[in-house]
Amino acid sequence: MANYHRIDTCNVTDGPGCRAVIWFSGCPFHCKGCFSPQTWHPKSGQLYDKQAREEMIKALEEPYCAGLTLLGGEPLAPYNIAEAYDLAVEAKKLGKTVWCYTGNTYEHIQDLDIMKYIDVLVDGPFIISKFNSNLKWRGSANQRVIDVQASLAAGTVVLHPDSNTVDKFYPEKAYDPCADMTPGEIKAKYLDIYE
């Protein structure tokens, strides 16, 4: 059973729209400059149990949720892939998109069963000497934002059409759960946990 570090039920930075995101524990790459080195050890964080799975599924069922993003650590590591696969299958059943960030390259993992459920793969290790804060959805220039289904069909890597543009929000794909709420209702529903 996998471990994970964090679940975010409405993340807007790791793929388009509001996304259910999980940071799996364990990573064999240990990239210099990694933004989440606390996830490197496979037994760090907490056990990905039935409750964690239910939290992710519930987040994916929300109408404002555009999809699932698998992060880490390394979501495709042998000790994480069964849980990552399960979440990807559930997300697709709900009509959601699936994004996955991996230190592997597409060519190395293209034959994994999970790939038929992944829409977009951000591949390759983070290389600090190739860091560029202007890149969309990735941190270093060697990483690629790949349209997985188009790549599988073409037999070669097909980049996501929006991978080299400046980051933007996708209002046509997102639902604002607070649009019809008063500031008091928003505070009561979402912010009281901080008081």
What are these model-derived regions, one by one?
Residues 1-23, 36-43, 157, 162-164, ...:
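N-terminal [4Fe-4S]-dependent radical SAM core
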Residues 2-6, 18, 36-100, 106-114:
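Conserved Radical SAM active-site core
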Residues 19-34, 74:
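Cysteine-centered iron-sulfur cluster-binding motifs in ferredoxin-type domains/subunits
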Residues 76-84, 88-92, 131-181:
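P-loop/Walker A phosphate-binding loop and immediately adjacent motor/lid segment at beta-alpha junctions
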Residues 113-116, 139:
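Short, conserved loop/helix-junction motifs that constitute active-site signature segments
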Residues 119:
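Receiver (REC) domain switch/active-site residues of two-component response regulators
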Residues 125-128:
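Short, acidic/turn-prone active-site loops that include or flank metal/cofactor-
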